């Protein structure tokens, strides 16, 4: 069975005109007849290409301010016609076959992303004819080639060159898959937008106002992720896995990072690298975060990245073995040398990597070196957690407090140095699994207690960690990701030598907790913000 199909007639109708002129010129050189609409047709005609307006092809003008342009049997019959089966019907209705459809859709996403977008603006950017043609061509991929991405123009031309102006079923099927994904994402965006609007009063005279109150979350949740890579296995070797990225998020991340060298990233590598990178983003000055099993085991500020790394490593060298290291500045040669000479590391990630640092890390061929780019601001987005039979959706935890937000509740006021350490410690605690306790001193973690069912045991573990590494807890500060339900955590901290505590507050026993701090001569501040992490 011959599955190669010649392209003799193409319909081009695009909102994003990137590369369309050059593509059309190449099609014309192949002898392809060009049909087009609106602005696309004008662009091609202005550059001397023979183009037939869709309205001339159908014999029916565009109507309703362009809302109806291509919804016509001569268009859709030409796309949907089954070659070798529907020729008699086509001849009877004067329908000509359309072999290639090149369409991308009205820019709905960028329209509604504009804070000044009205409901009317959104409605006028809902494409009707475009998705209809895309779906028709994708459905009939047995005979028709559909292109929705400008990045595929060169691929189609290469295919035509190889096959004397024709395309194979293989490429048509692959392009059809991309087309269905494209329309699914488009419809999902529209459904999400409208699902976020709550009808206040259907009988109001001001329809725009009635429909423009926004809800927190849509009635149905539509999101599309694109597979970036298959993974060797999942969290455990008996689990299959793949890594998908969110095309709507434009932010420096492990998902957008470029791997410069090393073995393929594993499922756990990706999860741990995300935890390390998101933590280090919290700091302005040179900072290093070392993560093991999604928990920071060492975090520090420094006069430069080398100093920050040395101090972060000092917190827990044992746990740092085989860990993930993240920086918030360009990885330099000195820091790279210190890492590869000192420890086994799975992943290093930084906004950028100097050539000298690349050359040094290259000596350890298995080390995964990632460059994620600089970050300016954090993108507002959602966190997801699957439960059996459902999905939990919430805003990302981007909350953080500054000096103006905290409240001193103890008799003793924190010193200026303690306040700096408190805010540093609080940033770290946000990224430690609950129950989370972090000891810190002079911009460096001293001990980290993570993931315990009892808060007091997390505090004890942080102290044990510090003791094991010979770090002095005396006059360190402590952060707790949630309030203390009993005074035992305060007593344990005092016994370890903690001088100051930062915590959310909000316990029914707050007075008892504050009294305990006062008894020990400790300073205590409340943030009014919790940072549970599960």
UniProtKB/Swiss-Prot annotation:
CDD domains membership: IMPCH
Domain MGS-like residue range list: 1-148
SMART domains membership: AICARFT_IMPCHas (SM00798), MGS (SM00851)
Catalytic activity: (6R)-10-formyltetrahydrofolate + 5-amino-1-(5-phospho-beta-D-ribosyl)imidazole-4-carboxamide = 5-formamido-1-(5-phospho-D-ribosyl)imidazole-4-carboxamide + (6S)-5,6,7,8-tetrahydrofolate; IMP + H2O = 5-formamido-1-(5-phospho-D-ribosyl)imidazole-4-carboxamide
Associated pathway: Purine metabolism; IMP biosynthesis via de novo pathway; 5-formamido-1-(5-phospho-D-ribosyl)imidazole-4-carboxamide from 5-amino-1-(5-phospho-D-ribosyl)imidazole-4-carboxamide (10-formyl THF route): step 1/1; Purine metabolism; IMP biosynthesis via de novo pathway; IMP from 5-formamido-1-(5-phospho-D-ribosyl)imidazole-4-carboxamide: step 1/1
Residues spanning the membrane: none
A single Gene Ontology CC term: cytosol
Keywords, in A-Z order: Hydrolase, Multifunctional enzyme, Purine biosynthesis, Transferase
Keyword hit for Secreted: no
Any GO BP: 'de novo' IMP biosynthetic process
Its EC number(s): 2.1.2.3, 3.5.4.10
Domain of life: Bacteria
One Pfam family in the UniProt entry: AICARFT_IMPCHas
UniProt GO molecular function: IMP cyclohydrolase activity; phosphoribosylaminoimidazolecarboxamide formyltransferase activity
PANTHER family: BIFUNCTIONAL PURINE BIOSYNTHESIS PROTEIN ATIC, BIFUNCTIONAL PURINE BIOSYNTHESIS PROTEIN PURH
Family: Belongs to the PurH family.
Domain notes: The IMP cyclohydrolase activity resides in the N-terminal region.
Protein's name in the database: Bifunctional purine biosynthesis protein PurH
Naturally occurring in which organism (per UniProt): Shewanella denitrificans (strain OS217 / ATCC BAA-1090 / DSM 15013)
């Amino acid at each position: 069975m011959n599955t190669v199909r010649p392209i003799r007639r193409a319909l081009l109708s695009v909102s994003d005109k990137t590369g369309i002129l050059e593509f059309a010129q190449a099609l014309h050189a192949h002898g392809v007849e060009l049909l087009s609409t609106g602005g696309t047709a004008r662009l091609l005609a202005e550059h001397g290409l023979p183009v037939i307006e869709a309205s001339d092809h159908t014999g029916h003008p565009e109507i309703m301010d362009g809302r109806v342009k291509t919804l016509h049997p001569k268009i859709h019959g030409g796309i949907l016609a089954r070659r070798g089966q529907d020729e008699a019907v086509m001849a009877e209705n004067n329908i000509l076959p359309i072999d290639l459809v090149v369409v991308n859709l009205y820019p709905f996403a960028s329209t509604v992303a504009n804070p000044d977008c009205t409901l009317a603006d959104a409605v006028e950017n809902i494409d009707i004819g475009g998705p209809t043609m895309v779906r028709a061509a994708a459905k009939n991929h047995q005979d028709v080639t559909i292109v929705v991405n400008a990045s595929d123009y060169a691929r189609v031309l290469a295919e035509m060159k190889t096959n004397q102006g024709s395309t194979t079923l293989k490429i048509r099927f692959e392009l059809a898959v991309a087309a269905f994904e494209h329309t699914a994402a488009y419809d999902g965006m529209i459904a999400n937008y409208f699902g976020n609007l709550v009808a206040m009063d259907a009988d109001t005279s001001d329809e725009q106002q009635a429909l423009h109150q926004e809800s927190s979350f849509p009635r149905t949740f539509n999101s599309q992720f694109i597979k970036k890579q298959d993974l060797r296995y999942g969290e455990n070797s008996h689990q299959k896995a793949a890594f998908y990225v969110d095309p709507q998020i434009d932010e420096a991340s492990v998902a957008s990072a470029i791997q410069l060298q090393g073995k393929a990233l594993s499922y756990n590598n990706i999860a741990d690298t995300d935890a390390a990178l998101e933590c280090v983003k919290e700091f302005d000055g040179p900072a290093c975060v070392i993560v093991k099993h999604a928990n920071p085991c060492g975090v520090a500020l420094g006069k430069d990245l080398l100093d920050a790394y040395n101090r972060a490593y000092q917190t827990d060298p044992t746990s740092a073995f085989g860990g993930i290291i993240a920086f918030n500045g360009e990885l330099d040669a000195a820091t790279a040398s210190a890492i590869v000479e000192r420890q086994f590391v799975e992943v290093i990630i930084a906004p950028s990597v100097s050539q000298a640092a690349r050359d040094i890390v290259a000596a350890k061929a298995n080390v995964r070196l990632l460059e994620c780019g600089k970050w300016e601001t954090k993108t507002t987005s959602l966190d997801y957690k699957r439960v059996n039979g459902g999905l939990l959706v919430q805003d990302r935890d981007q909350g953080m407090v500054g000096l103006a937000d905290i409240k001193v509740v103890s008799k003793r006021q924190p010193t200026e140095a303690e306040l700096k350490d408190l805010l540093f410690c609080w940033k770290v605690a946000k990224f430690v699994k609950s129950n989370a306790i972090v000891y810190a001193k002079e911009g460096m973690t001293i001990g980290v207690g993570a993931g315990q069912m009892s808060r007091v045991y997390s505090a004890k573990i942080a102290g044990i960690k510090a003791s094991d590494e010979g770090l002095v807890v005396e006059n360190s500060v402590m952060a707790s990701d949630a309030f203390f339900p009993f005074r035992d955590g305060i007593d344990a901290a005092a016994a370890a030598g903690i001088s100051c505590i930062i915590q959310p507050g909000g316990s029914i026993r707050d007075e008892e907790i504050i009294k305990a701090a006062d008894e020990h001569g400790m300073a205590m501040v409340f943030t009014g913000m919790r940072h549970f992490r599960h």
